[in-house]
Amino acid sequence: MCIRDSLCIAQKIVSKAEGCIYSLNDIKPSKKALKISDKLNKDPRKVEIILRESKNIIRIFKHKNQNEGVIICEHKLGFISANAAVDESNTGEIDTIITLPKNPDLSASKIGDYIYQKLNVSVGVVITDTFGRPWRLGQVNVAIGLSKVPATIDEKGKSDISGRRLKVTEPAFADEVAAASGLVIKKNSNTPVVIISGLNWKQENSKSNDLLRKIEEDMFR
């Protein structure tokens, strides 16, 4: 590996390694969780974990053709996601739930430091999770934890191929890398880690919340 390599790691294995896995049998739902669960036909224990992982509830919604509704949340880490990214897939046990790592940026940094200590190689690390998109179908992998990889690349002031000066262009580099990894990291692929090589980028001290839009710039909340 060289400094232009990016190591993309599925959030699930990081969460498992850090103990972010919970038995539903140990969860006692609050009154608020019970109330929401009735509206959404959702297990109140799951709702309780979602509430614990959330800073704000943005919307609860159940489509008439869906068996179970969804809670759109602002996670404690700042991400807007369905059900606070609480997940039941690939937990390894029945009636268990996995949540996001407590500090994905720190997790990414520790992994990068470990690789450097073992291999004397400085590599970028992106911890990924699968998010839905409000105006498009399907899900894509996004960056929820970063180490050395730039969150965005500011191209404002550069020129396009026609010589026109760019005014707002700022690709979300870390998210694009994460999305590419999703072509290999799948629910049933047994491939939780991907190395992406050959991209032209320089190491930065970006954080995952550099990808979050400020509330005063948010046109929809």
Label each residue range with its predicted role.
Residues 105:
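Glycine-rich and polybasic anion-binding loops at the starts of cofactor/ligand-binding domains
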Residues 113:
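Active-site phosphate/pyrophosphate- and oxyanion-stabilizing loops and adjacent acidic/basic residues
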Residues 1-3:
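Short, small-residue-biased leader/transition segments that mark boundaries at the very start
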Residues 11, 21-24, 32-95, 99, ...:
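A structural signal for small-residue-enriched, beta-sheet-centric alpha/beta enzyme cores
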Residues 17-18:
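Activation segment
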